[in-house]
Amino acid sequence: MRFMEEEFYKIFKGAGLIKTLIRSIFLTNRNKFSKPSKTKPIQLTECIGCGLCVDVCPTNAIKIFSFRETICSVCGTCVDVCPNNAIIKDRFTIDADKCTKCGVCVLFCPIPIIKKEIPKPKTPVILKDRCNSCGLCECEAIDIINKEINPEKCKLCLSCIEKCPLQAILTPDEYINSLIVKVDIDSCIFCRECEEICPIRGNYEHRES
């Protein structure tokens, strides 16, 4: 009996049947999991510029697309709502001299990307109504009397923001965000007082007429 077992094993080993059986049982569907040669191209017409793919990509292979060339749908809404005519329609650029950073164009833009086009201040911004001229920041770039930051002297170290006890200094990005109106719809009683004091309300009435 033992002789027959040894001979049977030699036959299997010599013919490679064991390996063949393993391949046929476990590796039959291997081709189904093969890596595709190329990634499916991005459908720019369907992209809303949310940036989620950029956040989750483990190899940082995806980058935010160019604003004017691919994402903007050229709807012109931002041009229509700008109270100071600061947005030029031919290339959807923003005139930094006219832009008051009111954020109205951001509220109306169906694809929330124009916010990146709003001109940002070159230095942190001091909120004068909060600043008490404490002088804790020893940086020569800060004018304590006028509560302003000299862009030529500021090194953007942001140490002034960390030291300010009243949180009266904002980064350029924080400053832009603070200008955009946010309404708590649960707390709003629809008194419309905000409309009465809004400085650009007259411009909207002029556009509607």
UniProtKB/Swiss-Prot annotation:
It comes from the Archaea. [4Fe-4S] cluster binds at residues 47, 50, 53, 57, 72, 75, 78, 82, 99, 102, 105, 109, 154, 157, 160, 164, 188, 191, 194, 198. Residues 38-67, 63-92, 90-119, 122-151, 145-174, 179-209 form the 4Fe-4S ferredoxin-type domain. It comes from Methanocaldococcus jannaschii (strain ATCC 43067 / DSM 2661 / JAL-1 / JCM 10045 / NBRC 100440). GO terms for molecular function: 4 iron, 4 sulfur cluster binding; metal ion binding; oxidoreductase activity. The keyword Cytoplasm does not apply. This is Uncharacterized polyferredoxin-like protein MJ0934. Pfam families: Fer4 (PF00037), Fer4_10 (PF13237). PANTHER family: ADENYLYLSULFATE REDUCTASE, BETA SUBUNIT, L-ASPARTATE SEMIALDEHYDE SULFURTRANSFERASE IRON-SULFUR SUBUNIT. Keywords: 4Fe-4S, Electron transport, Iron, Iron-sulfur, Metal-binding, Repeat, Transport.
